[in-house]
Amino acid sequence: MALANHHCNFDAWDSKHHPWNSAALGPHRDVVGTWAAAARKQGLRFGVTVHQARNWWWFQPSHGADKSGPLAGVPYDGALTEAQGKGQWWQGLDPQRLDGAKHPGDALPDVSYVKNFYDRTRDLIDQHNPDLLYFDDSLLPLGWGGMNIGAYFYNNSLKRNGGQMDSVLNVKDVPDRLLKAVAADYERGLTAGIMKYPWQSETCIGAWHYLRNLYERPGEYGGYQNPREVIHWLIDAVRKNRTFILNVPGRPDGTIDETELAVLDGITSWMEINGEAIYETRPWKISSYIEELRDNTTGTPEANDSVFYRWKQSILEHRAAKR
């Protein structure tokens, strides 16, 4: 899964409707397209995350200024204009299209903002045909814009797959009545029991963006989650009918550090032995399955291939539950 844009409003593909994009600036490459090609070369499904909607609210502070100190009253970047870019690396671009125009704090997104969101997200779908589209929002974002892009995404999937739905739409805070329409996402969240419909959980081995101080902390895995913690989260996801996304933040050049790699190596070592307990498996029928087996010594497990939590020699062992 690749980040298509974040709250900063910068598109990581060759966007036709937004000049602030990675093909025109920075790495001068279609980053989303690069990830899509790499994933599909390995036979993997590919997803994108879209976070643009919150730019309307979250970047309004860019139009302010310090209230005290030596730079009191000096406007932040949100006040920059296209004319001020002459001779700069961003010459010809309007910063107002990146940070967003200044507006009252309680103002709702206007028609032009919503249409721009729709046009850009539709372009993303058209160019890269993601199997999964993730919105960092409660339900579909920006009213009619989100509803229409959701419909377009689903209809595009039907068209590409001979009338079969083969795509997933992820959003947050989904009420029960809509769980058949979209897959609920829980950011760094868990549920107490098994969900009726498939859902998604996500976490990060550190912060959502790269923080060097996590890398520099002492210990085998620095300030990152260790493989054991990640694997426990993964097991909990599978047993409760959910998928699991693990974010590994990259440095500015796109690489990951050796400590992050060590975390992934630890997960890989466990998966090489126990992957059959994760892939193509069914959710449990009892959420506290381990406790049930311990308490019911005369009972018979639903399946004879379950995951038990036992740590040994730095690898979480998978053992068949046989009676």
Segments predicted by a language model, with ranges:
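Mature catalytic domains of secreted/periplasmic carbohydrate-active enzymes
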Residues: 1-323
